[in-house]
Design a protein with these regions (language model features):
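Short alpha-helical basic/polar micro-motif
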Residues: 208, 378, 382, 632
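Acidic, two-metal ion nucleic-acid-processing modules in DNA metabolism proteins
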Residues: 111, 116, 254-352, 386, ...
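Histidine/acidic-residue-rich, glycine-tolerant segments that coordinate divalent metal ions
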Residues: 150-204
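Acidic-glycine-rich active-site phosphate/pyrophosphate-binding loop
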Residues: 80-81, 180-191, 355-356, 527-528
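Hydrophobic helix-and-loop "lid/oligomerization" segment in the mid-to-C-terminal part
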Residues: 6-12, 16-25, 31-145, 166, ...
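Short beta-alpha junctions and helix-cap segments that line functional grooves
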Residues: 132-135, 151, 156-160, 173-175, ...
Length: 688
């Protein structure tokens, strides 16, 4: 993996930091949060002071006016008329997290405004993705005169024609990219990515578009004093979808995600509370974006992957905790089944790749198999991309039909690749880095050849090397509670706002790593050398400042900062002392405790427990031993465990310590001297 150290212009950092101190109240006595945040914001493309302030402190006032979205006003007019006439409406949504959350948002909003709304979420296997003619025909026969799609429909030309023929008005709300033929002929199309739409933010997920439609409807129908409370309630659900669908957490998405996660600490919906329970997330705090992505979203997705997503809508509609817990437990069990099926299919994929050398040489990997569960092929495609760093398509054959999912790397636009083969598909859709499709099984070989040719014309071998962006080099003594608190202002993390990654040179193992569950590593690391970028003679305080994290220039301030790191947690402690966990201390207390308990060279005595996820395989053939030095790339987190909690680091990558040219020369000289000495010993005395 290639590490790329990001840079920020010092003058820009200084200017933005001054603005943050002046207008946002961000500072710090022993640790300059403003400089830290300014540097990280600039490296994320946010250099304007007003944009930085909005990023750090999102509010409801930062939401764009919904009527700016093309088609939304016409959609609100038609829904408003249906409410007035007591017409039944049908909300037609996708079966993933984004689609089900969109259904919940719009259905609830319509009902709060006095309307009648039912929903349909297709069965993944029996019905597949997108609008279907037979569902529209059944709805029309039941008296439905308005169907609203959410998170789908932007390429549903034939179903739109069926709706028109049946006398049903169709409103398409979607966020997927329209095809080359434009958009379907519907009463209204609400999609910020359609041609002619001047909505200022294009990156909303499907539930985000549904949220904007709900916002516009409530502005039309409800008392203004009730709207903000309801918007925050809907944001809880929209935030889950926004994070799960991996859209950029910038602009309006950041407002939705940040405020929605904060509101989840006050969840009152029985379904939400039961879901947080089964995911083992404390109800007394806001969940993190990581917890949403890896604990909440998979359980919601499992319903649509393994069974029917209707259970998700029922969960969020439950009125009592007993029923909510029953449904949440069902989703939890479905997620366990999904994990087992995913492992089974992934083993088949690995066997196929290891047994076919041509696949490893392919610029685009296309794998197909009979009977692979269609609910997990997208996840397994992601796993193959993570392992081999190639665009990957996984296709499940079902007789004469085939259904596939694709996932991509940073340098390859997947939807463009798929569109170059559009004649091979019966239907398709997606984004730059994810897609889905259906096709005749007979076309798979042609697809494999054409996709690989398309990729070879656009990719270089260098594109297949994974790249890890590193925000700064950091010494263990600089990992402090104050740094962690500064980083928290950047949350929630996700696409477009990645969690800050740091690197450290020459971290030393105090013991051999422990292997956990045959996959992960637990390491005990102590600080290595001060990063090489620090010039000889610099003080520790200067070293910290050189990292770009604004530590005060006095030695006492540096000691206070580092003592705070040592005393904050039993996970970060001097070798020579066992320091009890305590509440926040004064600077004087920190100095006194550090003086009593720390070794004189305290910067080199700090020890961290570190977790390295899915890295056990990398040390099986070349074991790491106590005393070995490694270069690490890592993130900084916090464990809330009442006894063992505290600051912790998670490794994103590790490498055997790279020797500098000077170290190599020194070793060569030592080796040469040793060889000469040995030579003289073996040669015996000189003749007289």
């Amino acid at each position: 993996m290639k590490w790329v150290l990001k840079t920020a212009e010092p003058a820009q950092v200084k200017s933005l930091a001054q603005e943050l101190r002046s207008h946002s109240g961000i500072g710090g006595k022993t640790f300059d949060q403003a400089t830290t945040l300014a540097r990280l914001l600039i490296m994320r493309g946010i250099a304007d002071p007003e944009a930085a302030s909005r990023f750090l402190s999102p509010s409801l006032s930062h939401l764009h006016a919904p009527e700016k979205m093309l088609g939304l006003r016409a959609a609100v007019d038609r829904i408003d008329a249906a409410i007035e006439r007591k017409e039944p409406m049908l909300i037609y949504g996708d079966y993933d997290v984004d689609g089900t959350m969109a259904v919940i948002i719009l259905k609830t909003a319509i009902e709060l405004c006095g309307g009648l709304a039912d929903f349909h979420v297709p069965h993944r296997i029996r019905e597949g993705y997108d609008l279907r003619d037979d569902v529209i025909e059944r709805a029309a026969a039941a008296g439905v005169r308005l169907i609203i799609s959410v998170d789908m429909g932007i390429r549903a030309f034939a179903p739109a024609e069926t709706a028109r023929r049946m006398g049903v008005d169709l409103i398409v709300t979607d966020h997927h990219l329209p095809g080359p033929d434009g958009v379907p002929k519907a009463l209204a199309v609400v999609n910020p990515n359609q041609a002619g739409c001047e909505y200022p933010y294009k990156q909303l997920c499907g539930a985000g578009v549904a949220f904007k439609l709900a916002q516009g409807l409530m502005q039309r129908r409800l008392d203004p004093k009730d709207q903000n409370k309801l918007l925050l309630s809907f944001m809880k659900v929209a935030a889950i979808a926004t994070i799960a669908d991996a859209v950029p957490l910038t602009g309006e998405n950041r407002v939705i995600a940040k405020l929605g996660l904060d509101a989840l600490r006050h969840a009152v919906n029985p379904g939400l509370k039961a879901l947080l329970e089964v995911a083992q997330i404390s109800p007394n705090r806001a969940p993190t974006s990581t917890e949403v992505a890896f604990r909440i979203a998979p359980r919601i997705n499992a319903a649509g992957r393994m069974d029917v997503a209707r259970d998700v809508i029922e969960l969020f509609s439950a009125k009592d905790m007993a029923r909510a817990r029953e449904l949440a437990a069902k989703l939890d069990q479905l997620n366990t089944s999904r994990q087992e099926e995913e492992r089974r299919v992934l083993r088949s994929l690995e066997d196929r790749i290891s047994g076919d050398p041509t696949l490893c040489d392919a610029y685009c990997i296309v794998l197909d198999g009979e009977g692979w569960h269609r609910g997990v092929i997208g996840i397994t495609a992601t796993r193959v991309v993570e392992r081999y760093n190639r665009p990957t398509f996984v296709i499940s054959r079902d007789g004469e039909e085939a259904f596939g999912s694709g996932r991509s790397i940073r340098a390859f636009h997947l939807l463009e690749a798929v569109e170059s083969c559009r004649d091979l598909f019966s239907r398709y859709g997606g984004h730059a880095h994810a897609c889905g499709f259906a096709m005749p099984a007979a076309n798979i070989e042609a697809l494999r050849a054409r996709l690989d040719a398309f990729a070879r014309a656009r990719l270089r071998l260098a594109d297949f090397e994974p790249v890890l962006d590193v925000d700064a080099e950091l010494h263990f003594g600089e990992i402090t509670p104050e740094l962690f608190q500064a980083l928290r202002l950047l949350e929630p993390y996700g696409v477009g706002n990645p969690e800050p990654v740091f690197s450290a040179h020459g971290a030393k193992l105090t013991a051999p790593p422990r292997i956990l569950k045959d996959k992960h590593l637990k390491l005990k690391l102590t600080a290595g050398a001060i990063p090489a970028r620090v010039e000889a003679g610099d003080s520790p305080a200067s070293a910290a400042s050189a990292a770009g994290f604004g530590v005060s220039s006095t030695e006492d301030a540096t000691q206070e900062m580092s003592a705070a790191a040592i005393l904050a947690s039993p996970r970060c402690h001097p070798d020579s002392a066992s320091i009890p966990r305590r509440d926040v201390r004064t600077a004087a207390e920190n100095r006194n405790e550090a003086a009593k308990n720390s070794a004189p060279d305290w910067r080199r005595s700090i020890v961290f427990d570190a977790l390295a996820w899915n890295m056990a395989e990398r040390v099986q053939h070349s074991p790491l031993l106590a005393g070995d030095a490694i270069d690490i790339a890592f993130t900084i987190g916090h464990n809330d465990h009442p006894e063992y909690g505290g600051l912790e680091i998670s490794l994103r990558d590790l490498k055997r310590e790279a020797k500098t040219s000077e170290e190599t020369k020194t070793e060569a000289k030592v080796e040469t001297r040793s060889e000469r000495k040995a030579s003289s010993v073996h040669a015996g005395p000189h003749p007289a």
